[in-house]
Amino acid sequence: VDICPVGALTSTDFRFKMRVWFLKQSNSLDTESSVGANTVAWSREGVLYRVTPRRNDDVNDTWMSDSGRMLYKLVGAEDRLGKITVEGSHSTLESAINTAVILIKEGDVAVVGSGRSTVEEQFLTKKLADAASASASLVSRVGEGDGILISADRNPNVRGALVTGFISALPEQQLTALAADVDADKVKTIISVGEDLTVAGLSAEQLAK
């Protein structure tokens, strides 16, 4: 869909959904892997409609992976958290923060950061972990790379976590050590930043403790 000079060939995923001239363009990066392909995010009124490649001769030229184009759908996914809850009930932001502060003060805290976070977010995540005297973990994602547009490291910013000092070594794909600490009652509160812990090796039963 990027090779048609007159726009006669278009993506079926985007076709007829929104007039292009209504959309706001924001420069971004592909979050599929650590390649960091340059992209443009097209949105209107807070809704993301598509992602297209942005030229960078040193990284991705004028291309991006097909799978990377579809990642925008995760933003509006039905199973994504869309409201603030405490113990399964709707809550205000202030109440949720107060509850979190109480739990952090009780100690035995672990912080799970994300390799999808920006450097600034990882810096703040480290500050939070340090303030809470918490252990720090990061979830690794590994997949097949093509050597061009997709790397085997499927996290876009593990390097940022290393640079900020949030972690000191490359992460594992499963949070085995954290799961063991939960079972041994060494960890009573987990702060997860943008990660689904059930995918990273913790069971629903462990998280309910």
What are these regions (language model features)?
Residues V1, T10-K209:
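Catalytic alpha/large subunits of respiratory electron-transfer oxidoreductases
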